[in-house]
Design a protein with these regions (language model features):
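C-terminal helical subdomain
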Residues: 47, 63-99
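Active-site helix of classical SDR
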Residues: 21
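A transmembrane-helix-recognition feature enriched in membrane-embedded lipid enzymes
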Residues: 85-120
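Residue(s) in the substrate-gating loop at a strand-loop-helix junction
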Residues: 5
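Short, flexible catalytic-loop segment of classical short-chain dehydrogenase/reductase
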Residues: 50-60
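Active-site loop immediately N-terminal to the catalytic Tyr-X3-Lys motif
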Residues: 11-16
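Active-site-adjacent segment of SDR/Rossmann-fold oxidoreductases
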Residues: 10, 31-43
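Hydrophobic alpha-helix immediately C-terminal to the catalytic Tyr-X-X-X-Lys motif of short-chain
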Residues: 24, 28-36, 48
Length: 141
């Protein structure tokens, strides 16, 4: 199982390097999955792409419609995807359809819905991220 990110399926301002790494993970995982399938291997490959998870890594992220995910919820979905031999699973449900919507909608329409309606393009506006141990210790003094 490979844990990627929804950031590997949908571009987001202020996340270009992160998105590039996750796009790479998704492409690599899918290629390995196909290679194993072509070899008729009994090894199965599951790639999971969750939305923001409340682990501290994305502190300050604000999501208008889609809730920030709890780690326990994501863990259950990951295990379920593995048990069911799913090749790809977006979390929450429906995120695995992003590629479909990108393929059929004109870019302006896709950007309108995901940027303006869902607010995804502004989720990082107040991002602070997880504070390092040194930063936290300095504030405590």
């Amino acid at each position: 199982c490979t844990i990627a990110s929804a950031g590997g399926m949908i571009s987001n301002p202020k996340m270009s390097v992160y998105a590039a790494s996750k796009w790479g993970v998704i492409g690599w995982s899918d290629s390995v999955r196909i290679e194993l399938q072509e070899m008729k291997s009994d090894v199965h490959f599951t790639t999971v792409a969750p939305y923001y998870i409340n682990t501290g890594m994305f502190d300050g992220v604000k999501s208008r419609i889609i809730p920030i995910l709890k780690p326990e919820y994501v863990a259950k979905r990951v295990f379920r995807a593995i048990e069911r031999n799913k090749a790809f699973r977006g979390i929450p449900f429906g995120f695995h359809f992003i590629r479909f919507w990108q393929a059929i909608l004109p870019t302006r329409v896709f950007d309108f819905f995901f940027g303006k309606v869902f607010g995804i393009y502004h989720t990082m506006d107040h991002f602070t991220g997880r504070k390092s141990t040194k930063e936290s210790a300095g504030k405590a003094s």
